[in-house]
Each structure stands twice: as structure tokens, then as C-alpha cells.
Amino acid sequence: MTNKEILKKQIIYRSAHRGSKEMDILLGNFVKGHIDDFSDDDLKNLEQILFIEDEILYRWYFDKKDSDVIPNNKVSKMLKDFRLYQNK
């Protein structure tokens, strides 16, 4: 197993086992839908986001509160634009 494969597995697990159900669902679905599209740098950026406390991520995503803790990169922009329930 390569380092990238190991990192992907860790990210998949951590994104779905956060501690709050809302963030488990949001991050778990986001990661599940995008993990194979991410470059090595994107995976590192995503891992950095997963180290941020749920409360901060929740406010940033759901309440649209800006946070200096959230990095401004491609992955955070994709997450910000991610919608759990899209009309099909």
C-alpha cells in the first residue's frame, strides 16, 4: 500500500468519525465524493481541514462565519460549495 493510499484511508475514516453527526455526514459525504479527484497537495490540505474543531467547521459551513483557522485553498472552496442534498 502506498503512502497516498494510506493517507486516503485515514482521511476517509476521520471524515466520517468526527464526533458530531452533522460533521460526520457533511465531511464523510464530501470526502466520499471527491477523494479520488484530489492531488497529493489537495489531500494534505484536506487533512489539515480535518484537524480543525467541529464547532469551527460547523459555523464556517452552516452559519457562513468567516474563520482565520480555515485555510483558503482549493479544497476549502470545494467544501464551502458542497451541497449535501442536491436537486436532481
Segments the model singles out, each with a brief description of its role:
Residues T2-K44, I49-K88:
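Positively charged, polar, low-complexity stretches
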